[in-house]
Structure formats: structure tokens, C-alpha cells
């Protein structure tokens, strides 16, 4: 069994050693819940990593959105290169759930676009949890949604070992039952092909590796891992475990039992609808369900099969569905990052899902059992969660209640950086004063973050600053994840000096070059100007030794008073620690080096250069294939900036290839 092993030039420093010891002591004494209060830049992720290494327990880390999950995943992957660090988020690029609007008699069919790369990573996560113990899974709230039963998923697994006998037809049938597709022409993930005595399988958890099974009669002689693009053999394997191409695979006996259960519920529901004098709903439900039953009988699956999941898992009405939590071993560890946001999000998931499905059931689009295809209720999540460490700079009421108000603080930063100086100025002429402060900050070579209350104000302010020739951009909720990363990169590199936003300048936005955070209309009490929001926003200036925060307010609100007082308290503790240990604050600059790597890829390669570099189509095609692999690899590692650059370069090269051919 592999143990967790951190590979890093850094060692715990500042408050980290004490916090690590306290959390581990709490885990050893069987505390179910602990609170790690970590301020911005205090090294929360590195602290979590050290706790994982020392406890040596499989770990799930929950984040409240995909961007933060990706950030934590990337950091953990770099810290634990020899261990399994996995990513588990929703695999939908686009998702429109089925819904019915009774007022207009409008039924909206389910429509979705699945991201193959993220689906692959979800399979890799569940596979790792079933195969090994040195596993860290970084997940969004997706982990509380229904997933195939781990028992069935493992039961359906095909275990392959050289020297064993496997009747060929039986093996091919097993692969089909695992929802692998036979394709002897287009070999891609989730497919298998047959060539003579060889069977090639492209596993669901790989994007660039496949397995070749070499037989002599029914005896499996060798298993080779190979590159599906070039055919090059990469390794000889002692064994291979083939898991389902879907988390909802199940044996035929289970399907047959489920069909019986669905038919029984259908008859009861039809009788109920008839008794309510609802002929349209009766006919609709019968037609839709009979079609699904036909598909299940013939293929073992149907569109929207997850709505019948209760019958496949053998659970009773109202019981919680199987989720990722059931794949975790009993001694697993859970970290809830930015818990002040994540916990309320978990609490809200169930009600929204049920409200939509209840309408579908009432109007004959779904059986009542569809209500059991759902996320966990908050109470269920609270029951299922293993020993938990909540992580936040601003703990919420649930975490404080669970931990009895006891927190483990991470206030001293390893870099010696202080919480920023907070200045309160009148809001009357806030824009004019902001421009003056911007000039000073930009002249020092730093960047400016400005947060407003409304989208209209953010747009107007951005346009006004651009008219005044300030390099300004606006970050809003409609910006795609990759575009968001590009905007932040441009800010870091100085292509942009000022970034304006509303509620996007809070958790997880780390800009070491930020010298000023300006909070407009800070005295307008509400969600965006609450104590928690203000502390989180103030934290954006805490990665620069010269960082300042200006709160524009005409009156002192309770939220401003508490946020500024807490920041001052932390700043004084940090100053005393620095003076005692002779530490000089240093601006964080490590992330800048990561950007330098992306610049090695020239995305501005034009077609003329391509013709010069590659004098024939064959050479160019080989290079294009190589770049495609690199792009997919970058995407799988969530290195989005690199993937975008490679994508742009590929587009240019493919145009050049057309001209050469």
C-alpha cells in the first residue's frame, strides 16, 4: 500500500505546524467536526496536505464551485505526484433538466452536453477509491448527487490476469454489459476492438492509454498498455481491472427485477390518476413509461434511466440515493473548503431539485420514484459525512455550532505578510477619489481590484475608466471559466491594470500583484456588504506587502466595524509575530513562474511559419497529432491556459495542413 508523500521544497511554517498538530490531535481523539480558520495566504491547502500526509487516510475535499475545485486539485496534484489525486465535478458542459411549466402547458425535454474529459476523471476517481487507499478526491457539490451503486459497480468489474482462461465470447459479452461499444474502426474511450487473437480495450478512465489483451486460444497470455494513437507499447501489466463505462451499469438480473418494480409502480400510479379523473396525465405516463420499459428490456438502459435508480439499487421510497460518499472507506477524511459558502449550498440543493420533479410527477411525465433520484438532504449529508474539517476565513453558524465555537486559527502567514491596511473614505465622491488612488497604485507597478454593488454600475465604471485610457476589464458571471482565467492572467501580466467586478472578487481570487482593493458603497448593508463578504474581499489585498483596502462609506455599519476590527486584530498578531522572529513581509510571487511556462507555447504561429517549419503534409499531420495529445493532457490536468494556447495553435496548423494537402 502506498503512503501519502508530499513532494515540496517548503516545510510548514508560521501558524501551520501548530494548526496541523491541533487538527491531528482532534482527529485522533475522534472529534467528528473541527474548524480550521485560515486567512487568505496562510497556506490552507498546504496545511490540509500535511494533515492528509500525517494521517494517511483517503480524503474527500469539497469546494463550492468548479473553479475552486480545479485550483485545489492542481495544487494537490503538484504536492502529491506519487499518489492518486482525482477530480469529481458535474460532467455537463451544458445541462437543461426536463421540466414542465403548467401555466403555459410547456414541457421542456432534458438537453445536455457531456464533457468527455470530466466524465473520464469521474471514472478515474471512483476507480481509485475502489482500488487503493492513497486517494484524494477534490469535488464540487456534485458528490451529493445520485451515482450508481458502488456494490453493483464493483460487482460488474472484469478482472483480467495473464495465465487465466477467459472464453472469448463471454469476455466480449461482459464488455458489452459494461456498456463498452465494439468499434473496429474508430477506437476511442469506452470502446473495444477485436483483431485476430488480440482484444484492445480503451478504458473509461484513460484518454491516452489503452490495453491490448493477447490470447492463445482462451488463455490470456499478455496484457500490454499502449498508445492508441501511435500503437507504441508503453508497459506490460500484471493485471487489469475493467470497470463500467457508466456508473449505472448493472447485471441483467438487477435490470429484470427493476422492470418488475417499475411495472408495479406504473399500475398503481395509473389507477391513482384515473381516480383523480386525469385522462391526459394517465395516457402520457403510460406511453412514456412503457417506452422506457421496452428500451430497458432490449438494451438494459434507456434515456433518463437515472429516474428509475431506486429500483436498480433496491432502495425503498424516500431512502437516500447512493452517492460518492458510499465509495469512501469508513476511515475517510472530509475537508469542506470555504465552508461558509459550501454548507449553505449543500443545504439548498434538495429543495430546488424536488420542486421541479414534483411538477413532472403531478402531470404524468414521471413516476413518483423519480423523486428519489436526487441530491442528499442536508440531514443525510450530515449523517453520512466522515470526520470533517471545515475550512474558512469566515466560519458560518453551522460550523461554529458543530465545533462548539472552537476554532484552529491560521493567522500567521509563512511569508510574513500582514492583513492589509483598511482605510475608510466618504462615498460621496468615490469614483473621483478611486481614480486618484488608482494612479498612485498603477505608478507603483501594482494592479487594482474594484468591487461594485450592481452589474450596471460595474459596466458603466468599466466603460468610464476605459474612456480615460485605463487598461480596465470587467469580470462578470457570464464569463466562461477559460475566459475568466485569461482575464486574470492578463491582469497578472499587466495587460490589464484594473479589474471591476461584483461578487466575483472574493473566495479563491489570488492576485499577488494587487496593491489596492476598492470597495464602493461599502455602507450599503446586504449580502454583498455583509461582514463575511467584506472580510473575504479585504483578503484579496493580503498577498502583497504593499496591499491596501479602501472602503467607501458615508456611515459606519456593523458589518464594516466588525470586518475592519477583525482585520486589525489579525494584523496586530501578525506584526507582533514578525517583530519577535525578525521576519520581513515578502510579496508572494510563486504563481508568476507558472505563467512563464504557458508563454513557451506560441499561440500566434501563423500559416506562413507553419509552411516553413513543415515542408510536407505528413510531417505537419504528425505534429498536429502530437499537439492534440498535449492539449488533451493539459485539459485533463486542468491547465486551462496551456490548453487554450494549444487549441489556438492547432487551429492555425490545421488550416495550414489543408493548404499543403
Swiss-Prot record:
Pfam families: Helicase_C (PF00271), ResIII (PF04851), UVR (PF02151), UvrB (PF12344), UvrB_inter (PF17757). Residues 621-656 form the UVR domain. Residues 430-592 form the Helicase C-terminal domain. A motif (Beta-hairpin) lies at residues 91-114. Residues 25-182 form the Helicase ATP-binding domain. GO terms for cellular component: cytoplasm; excinuclease repair complex. The keyword Mitochondrion does not apply. Coiled coil: none annotated. PROSITE patterns: HELICASE_ATP_BIND_1, HELICASE_CTER, UVR. ATP binds at residues 38-45. It is found in: Cytoplasm. The keyword DNA damage applies. GO terms for molecular function: ATP binding; ATP hydrolysis activity; DNA binding; excinuclease ABC activity; helicase activity. InterPro entries: Helicase/UvrB_N (IPR006935), Helicase_ATP-bd (IPR014001), Helicase_C-like (IPR001650), P-loop_NTPase (IPR027417), UVR_dom (IPR001943), UVR_dom_sf (IPR036876), UvrB (IPR004807), UvrB_inter (IPR041471). It comes from the Bacteria. GO terms for biological process: nucleotide-excision repair; SOS response. The UvrABC repair system catalyzes the recognition and processing of DNA lesions. A damage recognition complex composed of 2 UvrA and 2 UvrB subunits scans DNA for abnormalities. Upon binding of the UvrA(2)B(2) complex to a putative damaged site, the DNA wraps around one UvrB monomer. DNA wrap is dependent on ATP binding by UvrB and probably causes local melting of the DNA helix, facilitating insertion of UvrB beta-hairpin between the DNA strands. Then UvrB probes one DNA strand for the presence of a lesion. The beta-hairpin motif is involved in DNA binding. Forms a heterotetramer with UvrA during the search for lesions. Interacts with UvrC in an incision complex. PANTHER family: UVRABC SYSTEM PROTEIN B. This is UvrABC system protein B.
